[in-house]
Amino acid sequence: MQEFNPANVPAHVAIIMDGNGRWANARGLPRTMGHRKGVEAVRGAVRTAAEIGIRYLTLFAFSSENWNRPENEVSDLMGLLKAFIRRDLADLHRENVRIRVIGDRSNLSGDILPLLIEAEETTIANTGITVVIAFNYGARDELARAMRRLAGEVAAGRLRPEEITAERISSTIDTAGIPDPDLIIRTSGEERLSNFLLWQGAYSELLFIPDLWPDFTRETFFAAIEQYACRERRFGGLTQPTLAVGS
């Protein structure tokens, strides 16, 4: 088994899981089959991240724009998420995985919200890897919701405008308490962030890989961490560049 120096492993990796539909189309299969295969890749990614020593793994599961997809595809995606939680929650809990969910919950209906809450509450005391599920998530919406909360605090006299700092914003958005991602990976060869972690990813390393998400394997993940290891992270500075991992 390949090993990384724990001091050199990114604490937080976020993944835009792209390419399920194209994977299915290339094989003459319904798009829903691509999503089902993608769930298998999720299971593997969680195991591999824990094996590597990553502390936080954020997965872009369903964007706030995905509601615009065909109704049958949205329904299948909802069904897959619910099935994943029902089938895998006990195993994840047993493996000391903590689940957190980010995104707008205000308009979620049916049985999906109770399941998301159950996943969080069941694993809240776990101390292993934290898997952050970005569901009904969009970065612009996240910031708008945070700004409304802060504006309400100002209007109520509990907060002065000059107290709205970058730190205050970070503690108000959905990922409060979670470190910013060190590495953001997008599969399928597309090279854009698609409204994902725009605030948190200000200094993240970006890695765009050609593999479609269902083809994302343990070896793919290890190769991504190796590439991260070769990068220099300056965080906007000009002096004393720091390698992503020790030399």
Curated annotation (Swiss-Prot):
Its EC number is 2.5.1.-. Substrate binds at residues 19-23, 31, 35, 63-65, 67, 69, 186, 192-194. Its cofactor is Mg(2+). Mg(2+) binds at D18, E205. The keyword Metal-binding applies. One of its GO terms (biological process) is polyprenol biosynthetic process. GO terms for molecular function: ditrans,polycis-undecaprenyl-diphosphate synthase [(2E,6E)-farnesyl-diphosphate specific] activity; magnesium ion binding. Binds 2 magnesium ions per subunit. Belongs to the UPP synthase family. This is Isoprenyl transferase. It comes from Rhizobium meliloti (strain 1021).
